[in-house]
């Protein structure tokens, strides 16, 4: 059996919202495998499906620039929120986002080689690092193209902690911005149910079945309950089926259709997604309770 470390318990607790002892028990039962431990907690009804935002832990800001039929969404990282709020950092972010929308590089390496008045974009980033005393880095970006009849919708939340960019066919810019606001707030994983892989469907169906059996439901109605729960789950993670944040009486797809539009694409950045940040005090708390 794998040794369960306090850091693992801390990570699972943060991801699932479970108590320390429940998290430790799940890790023991799954031999330290984080994904299996999460499934264990869900089967026991202790945790719900993890959202991407559960893993947010870095500083910086995101921004969006639109240049004709091209838009760019960019994340720039710093070591502290203090530097992220500084004018040199915010000025650099605006410059980086604008240049990426204009030059359309294929990756971060190409973006860093974009020519500027100071040499390259990488030189500008180094200069800002020197000004602020902290490492500043271009973490990621996405360049999005649209057709002439499409609309971009861009929305920044909390000054750029979350950025959402959508493309709608047919609808106007105001409708597209409304959908971008929804994406920022609700954080869908997929555009439609057709975008969810069969592997993901099978995985979720198995989790819901185990959860339902653990609740003691009669076996003859288990499959019906499972399909109902799976249907509800899909309506929560697919943009088209989600209740529209500004009018819960209609779905996002219905709202866009009412404006003579059609959903085409969306992308959402949350600063620090997928980066774990050291949490010394919390780790000590876990260690104390495990001993």
Curated annotation (Swiss-Prot):
Disulfide bonds: none annotated. Pfam families: EF_TS. Its main location: cytoplasm. Keywords: Cytoplasm, Elongation factor, Protein biosynthesis. GO terms for cellular component: cytoplasm. It is found in: Cytoplasm. Residues 80-83 are annotated as: Involved in Mg(2+) ion dislocation from EF-Tu. GO terms for molecular function: translation elongation factor activity. The keyword Protein biosynthesis applies. Associates with the EF-Tu.GDP complex and induces the exchange of GDP to GTP. It remains bound to the aminoacyl-tRNA.EF-Tu.GTP complex up to the GTP hydrolysis stage on the ribosome. HAMAP family: EF_Ts. Belongs to the EF-Ts family. This is Elongation factor Ts. It comes from Limosilactobacillus reuteri (strain DSM 20016).
